[in-house]
Amino acid sequence: PIDPPNAVLYTSSHRFEPLMPQIALGKLVDETRRVFELSHELRGSLHPVTLMAVRELVRSMNSYYSNRIEGQGTHPGNIDRALRADFSTRPDVARRQRVAVAHIEAERQLEARTANVVWRDVDALRSDLLIDAHRALYGRLPEDDRRSPEGIVIAPGSVRVDDVTVGRHDAPAHGSIRAFFGRMDDTYPKLRGVDSLLCGIAAA
C-alpha cells in the first residue's frame, strides 16, 4: 500500500481523459493506416513458420518491457532460458523469470481468445478483457510470486481493495477503479472504422 498523505491519488474518471487523441487527427489517421498496411504486407510476405517465430519474439519483447516498466524486469537471456524451463538458482531472478513466462503464456491465451473477434464491435477494448488479462497472468503464478513487497497477495482477476504504487507510479484510488472502467467502456466500444480502432488500441 501507499501512504496517502504522501501521494496524490486519482479518484475521478475525468483524470483519465482524453481517452482518444483530440488534435492532429488527420495526421494520426495517415500514420495508423500505414501501420495497418505494413502489417498486412508483412503477414502476406512471411512463411507461416517465420511469422510464428516473429510473433514469439515480439511476445518476449512485450514481456521484457512490460515487466521492466513495473520494476519486475529481467534480462532477455533469462527469459529465453525460462522458456526452456531453465530457471536461475537465485530466488529473485527465478521469480522474475516465472513472471515473464506467465506474461508470455497469458498473451498467447488472450490472443487466441480475440482471434475471431469482429473488430467493429471492439470487444477487445472493454474492461472485461483487462480483468481477464489480470486473471490469465496472475492465475499462472504461485502465491509467493503474487505477493507484493508489502505482503499483499494479488488475487487473479480481482479488483484491488488497497491503494498501491507500481514502480514509481501511484495507481488510481482503489475505490474509483470501477468508475475508470465504466468510462473506458463508455468510450472505446463506440469507435468505428480501422483508423479509429488503431488509434484506440494505442490510446488504451
Which residues fall in each region the model found?
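FIC/Doc superfamily catalytic core
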Residues: P1-A204
